[in-house]
């Protein structure tokens, strides 16, 4: 029998999808990290960092996990940490989406919001203050924790190599904490030094390219500084992506492939598409690591409540979002689209979904 006893046992072994409708004939594959239990690549890092801390005696029973996070690491730490009996306190910029905050609260995390203009730097400073003032606290410190990158060296990288039969030519990945591109990149280059690793960052905060940090809307990447865990020698090229290109590409993947992805996934896919257009990459296999699912279902549910006065659940939000994508197609102009909203939203009132 294949029965998991705990949710973290289901982390990893996510599928590869050929994006043939999104990029016909381009040889672009998507590593769908949204198939992890809580829908992101951070599930891997969260599990590895907690297990590593337990093994080294840094996490004692009843301890408090404190971490600055832009969202998905917090989701992973919340559900894994709470399941293992820890209190989880997360600091994050106030610019993070209400949907993400609601999800974290629903998982039992305590949120501390910091000034948005200070970016992740402000969240990190606040987390350090809490670490010093909270007895029994431990900080995973994803930006500096080697277990973050090791999670991807030992799992994501081998999966990509196995599933492509060693045929991956180019890896495209966004850079947030740097753990994913470092771990996967180091593993792939250990198998084939000729594999090209491409880093993706927000054009509004091109720190890796030598620019200045700044505000941007590509949640999950672009921390505004160079993380210590990031191996800056592992990537061969950096591609900055504009906010709108990330948004539009994410929507295109949804409408062409039926896969709802987040903004950072849209950024990685956009960069992969630009690489596929280059003559030197003709016939090559390009893998875009899509780290997260979209928050569109949550956002659509909130929008239904605000604009139509309809208290709809998340599954209804997903249906409404899909209908909106259909309505934007030229072939649907003038047509009547009926949407079935299968659930009400009263069960989500306690999570802050409609706050």
Where are these regions (language model features)?
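PLP-dependent amino-acid enzyme catalytic core
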Residues: 1-355
């Amino acid at each position: 029998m294949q029965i998991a006893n705990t949710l973290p046992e289901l982390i990893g072994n996510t599928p590869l999808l050929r994006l043939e409708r999104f990029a016909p004939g381009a040889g672009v594959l998507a590593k769908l990290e949204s198939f992890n239990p809580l829908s992101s690549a951070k599930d891997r890092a969260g599990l590895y960092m907690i297990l590593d801390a337990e093994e080294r005696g840094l996490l004692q029973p009843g301890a408090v996990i404190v971490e600055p996070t832009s969202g998905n690491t917090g989701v992973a730490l919340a559900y894994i940490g709470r399941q293992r009996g820890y209190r989880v306190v997360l600091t994050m910029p106030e610019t993070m989406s209400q949907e993400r905050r609601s999800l974290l609260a629903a998982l039992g995390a305590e949120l501390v919001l910091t000034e948005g203009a200070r970016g992740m730097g402000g969240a990190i400073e606040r987390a350090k203050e809490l670490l010093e003032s909270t007895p029994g606290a431990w900080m995973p410190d994803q930006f500096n924790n080697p277990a973050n990158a090791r999670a991807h060296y030992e799992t994501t990288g081998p999966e990509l190599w196995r599933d492509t039969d060693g045929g991956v030519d180019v890896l495209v990945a966004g850079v947030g904490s740097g753990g994913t591109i470092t771990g996967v990149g180091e593993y792939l280059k250990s198998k084939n030094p000729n594999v090209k690793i491409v880093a993706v960052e927000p054009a509004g905060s091109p720190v890796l390219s030598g620019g200045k940090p700044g505000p941007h809307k590509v949640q999950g990447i672009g921390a505004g500084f160079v993380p210590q865990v990031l191996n800056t020698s592992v990537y061969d090229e950096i591609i900055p992506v504009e906010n709108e290109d990330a948004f539009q590409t994410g929507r295109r993947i949804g409408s062409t492939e039926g896969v709802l992805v987040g903004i950072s996934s849209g950024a990685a896919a956009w960069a992969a598409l630009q690489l596929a257009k280059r003559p030197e990459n003709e016939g090559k296999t390009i893998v875009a690591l899509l780290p997260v699912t979209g928050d569109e279902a949550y956002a659509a549910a909130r929008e239904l409540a605000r604009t139509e006065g309809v208290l709809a659940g998340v599954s209804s939000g997903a249906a409404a979002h899909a209908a909106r994508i259909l309505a934007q197609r030229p072939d649907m102009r003038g047509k009547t689209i009926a949407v079935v909203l299968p659930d009400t939203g009263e069960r989500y009132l306690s999570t802050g979904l409609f706050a």
